[in-house]
């Protein structure tokens, strides 16, 4: 889990546009965030296995 101070800092509008970055909406993780779902890879995997993300299923070939 991310610190509350870092989550609050990220929500503020930055002075420059390039300072914006993605953060997982569920746990606050700043790295490996899937933009389409706004989730980090770990949270995405957990929710996908539970079937809570519509249209996502485990690949098999």
From Swiss-Prot:
Name the PROSITE patterns for this protein.
RIBOSOMAL_S14
Q: Where does Zn(2+) bind?
A: 24, 27, 40, 43
Cofactor(s) essential for the protein: Zn(2+)
Q: Which Gene3D superfamilies does the UniProt entry name for this protein?
A: 30s Ribosomal Protein S14, Chain N (4.10.830.10)
Query: Which terms are listed as keywords in the entry?
Result: Metal-binding, Ribonucleoprotein, Ribosomal protein, RNA-binding, rRNA-binding, Zinc
Q: Where is the signal peptide?
A: none
Q: Where on the tree of life does the source sit, at the highest rank? A: Bacteria
The Gene Ontology CC terms held by the record are: small ribosomal subunit
Q: Which residues form a coiled coil?
A: none
GO MF term set: rRNA binding; structural constituent of ribosome; zinc ion binding
GO biological process entries: translation
Q: How is its cofactor bound, per UniProt?
A: Binds 1 zinc ion per subunit.
Q: Which family does it belong to?
A: Belongs to the universal ribosomal protein uS14 family. Zinc-binding uS14 subfamily.
Q: How does it assemble?
A: Part of the 30S ribosomal subunit. Contacts proteins S3 and S10.
Q: What does this protein do?
A: Binds 16S rRNA, required for the assembly of 30S particles and may also be responsible for determining the conformation of the 16S rRNA at the A site.
Name recorded for this polypeptide: Small ribosomal subunit protein uS14B
Source organism per entry reads: Bacillus licheniformis (strain ATCC 14580 / DSM 13 / JCM 2505 / CCUG 7422 / NBRC 12200 / NCIMB 9375 / NCTC 10341 / NRRL NRS-1264 / Gibson 46)
- State the encoding gene: rpsZ1
